[in-house]
Amino acid sequence: MKKVLALVVAAAMGLSSAAFAAETTTSSAAPATATATTTKAAPAKTVHHKKHKKAVEQKAQAAKKHHKKAVKKQEAAPATTTAPVEQKAQAAKKHHKAAAKPAVAQKAQAAKKHHKKAVKHEAAKPAAQPAA
């Protein structure tokens, strides 16, 4: 029992197959489990290697993002006087549109309604005059 327990502990620690052979010379089932653990360890290394490659790609993307930000800052630095003016112009346009368009549209609709009512009365009056 102690040798089997020692084998399990050694397999968990990842010792070499030579150490397994030295400890487990009496049992024949133990080397079979040792080879099984070593075959499982090999794919784990390849999976870990793939994850490492993905991390490198992420770093490259982050570097590209920072580079773009730096370019924007460099372009904005010479045009510092024009950038605030553009922002003010956009704000002025927004306020101007909000103040002018809804008020004009409401007045136009109200004028159309009153104009239509006046047309109806005018159309009804001439029709009544020839009959009388």
From Swiss-Prot:
InterPro entries: Acid_shock
Post-translation changes: Proteolytic processing gives rise to the active protein.
Stretches with biased composition (Low complexity): 20-45, 76-90, 100-109
Segments for region (Disordered): 20-132
Keyword annotations: Periplasm, Signal
Pfam families: Asr
Signal sequence, start to end: 1-21
Biased composition (Basic residues): 62-71, 110-119
Compartments reported by the entry: Periplasm
Keyword Lyase tagged: no
GO CC annotation terms, alphabetical: periplasmic space
Propeptide residue range(s): 22-90
Main location: periplasm
Domain of life: Bacteria
NCBIfam families: acid_shock_Asr
Function (record text): Required for growth and/or survival at acidic conditions.
Family of the protein in this entry: Belongs to the Asr family.
The name this protein goes by in its record: Acid shock protein
Organism: Enterobacter sp. (strain 638)
